[in-house]
């Protein structure tokens, strides 16, 4: 029988972040991936199907997770990418102050943004292009074995295998593992999640599984036919090579590599658009088949910001499935509550433990914003920052500087966000603006950062394919 209350004063904490994992690809019905280990965590825990990331880019999202603060209070909300404000007390620091040993295994991009500064292991990051199947999975398992006696511990694992370009291992390439390459890779990642949780004492460990953001999957069913615009094996291999080379190219040659990547990307987009010509596609179908999370537009559709959130293990009741909207900023306040730490003051998130335990709590609106831009933008990128607010029922987006409300969606009747109702719903716009204004009341002026740091950050993001 599952233990609901730990007799150990300080349980271990395992945070698994699967980069780019969409909520509807691991929680709910009609899943084509094989995920017995994620299913095990859900069965033995609480699963939230409507968790919202503040932005569809890793550093901004992770800063909100680690601080419980919206991006405009972490120093990450600006016209350019920035490092996490070093004056902010993260939950990792708080855990260390309460006797926790802190460890991380995360892609090197997290270090560039100051997200792994508070972890004690010197090998807290790995090269962004390294896969679980390149030895990283074994390294994580070995790490779990080595820290077993260093209780209590907090271990942050950030899995990058689902981040484009996706290269599916041969053992998971069969159709039974998923309809798309993306879904096959979810099956592959689930295997390693199983290996990880085998090495964890769930009676004395709180396991949290989530994602930083989602992604578009360019595969649709049309007239009983499957149209698949995911990168072919050859394209994926070329993308992977370019990605890996990106970390070896000298800084002075990065602009040339960037131009080559732009040419290849633009050529692929035009090719995809040509393939779509003549097809009767819905706005949603056209969006997922042609657009990309890495570049262009506000990138605030649910495909990109709705992520899974699962709490499992010590002090968590079993088989709780919760559809109420929650947010990234709620994750650590919940962890704090589960392990009975004093509450961190002046945060934007709140504990979900009462909701997990069956109590009704008020649903909080989620703040969302478009990612910062890189200086080498192409003409189709939105120049003015878009900010917004989301509830379970509606989503509103507005231009931050001009204040113009540009999009409004009824998420109940239009979950694919195909019909912009902003012009026909003035009262609703007013109500949503009021919610956003209340959230923004604590807006903080972003601190100035060293230009060398900013330039380095932008070079690293360009290597990953952001533009």
Whereabouts are the PLM-identified features?
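Catalytic domains that recognize anionic headgroups
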Residues: 1-467
């Amino acid at each position: 029988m599952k233990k609901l209350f730990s007799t150990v004063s300080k349980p271990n904490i395992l945070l698994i972040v699967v980069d780019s994992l969409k909520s509807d690809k691991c929680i709910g019905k009609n899943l084509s991936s094989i995920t017995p280990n994620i299913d095990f965590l859900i069965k033995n825990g609480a699963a939230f199907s409507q968790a919202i990331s503040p932005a569809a880019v890793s550093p901004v999202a992770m800063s909100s997770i680690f601080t419980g603060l919206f991006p405009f209070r972490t120093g990450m909300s600006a016209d350019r990418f920035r490092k996490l404000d070093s004056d902010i007390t993260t939950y990792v620091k708080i855990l260390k102050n309460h006797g926790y040993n802190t460890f991380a295994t995360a892609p090197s991009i997290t270090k560039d943004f100051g997200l792994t500064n508070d972890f004690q292991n010197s090998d807290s990051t790995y090269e962004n292009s390294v896969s679980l199947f390149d030895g990283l999975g074994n390294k994580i398992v070995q790490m779990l074995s080595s820290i077993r006696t260093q209780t209590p511990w907090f271990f942050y694992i950030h899995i990058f295998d689902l981040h484009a370009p996706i290269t599916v291992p041969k053992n998971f390439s069969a159709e039974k593992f998923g309809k798309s390459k993306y879904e096959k890779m979810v099956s592959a990642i689930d295997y390693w999640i199983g290996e990880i949780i085998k090495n964890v004492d769930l009676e004395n460990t709180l396991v949290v599984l989530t994602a930083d953001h989602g992604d578009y999957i360019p595969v649709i069913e049309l007239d009983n036919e499957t149209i698949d615009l995911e990168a072919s094996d050859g394209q994926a291999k070329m993308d992977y090579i370019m990605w890996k080379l990106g970390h070896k190219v000298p800084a002075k040659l990065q602009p040339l590599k960037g131009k080559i990547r732009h040419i290849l990307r633009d050529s692929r987009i035009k090719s995809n658009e040509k393939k779509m010509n003549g097809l009767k596609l819905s706005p949603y179908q056209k969006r997922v088949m042609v657009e990309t999370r890495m570049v262009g537009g506000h990138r605030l559709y649910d495909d990109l910001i709705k992520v899974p959130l699962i709490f499992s293990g010590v002090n968590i009741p079993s088989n709780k499935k919760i559809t109420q909207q929650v947010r990234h900023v709620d994750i650590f306040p919940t962890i704090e509550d589960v392990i009975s730490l004093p509450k961190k003051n002046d945060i934007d998130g709140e504990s979900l433990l009462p909701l997990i335990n069956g109590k009704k709590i008020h649903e909080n609106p989620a703040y969302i914003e478009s990612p910062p831009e890189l200086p080498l933008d192409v003409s189709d990128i939105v120049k003015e920052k878009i900010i917004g607010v989301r509830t379970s029922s509606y989503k509103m987006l507005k231009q931050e500087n001009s204040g113009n409300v540009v999009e409004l969606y009824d998420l109940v009747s239009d979950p694919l966000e195909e019909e912009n109702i902003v012009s026909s719903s003035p009262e609703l716009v007013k109500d949503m603006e009021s919610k956003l204004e209340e959230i923004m009341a604590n807006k903080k002026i972003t601190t100035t950062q060293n230009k060398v740091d900013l330039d380095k950050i932008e070079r690293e993001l360009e290597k990953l394919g952001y533009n």
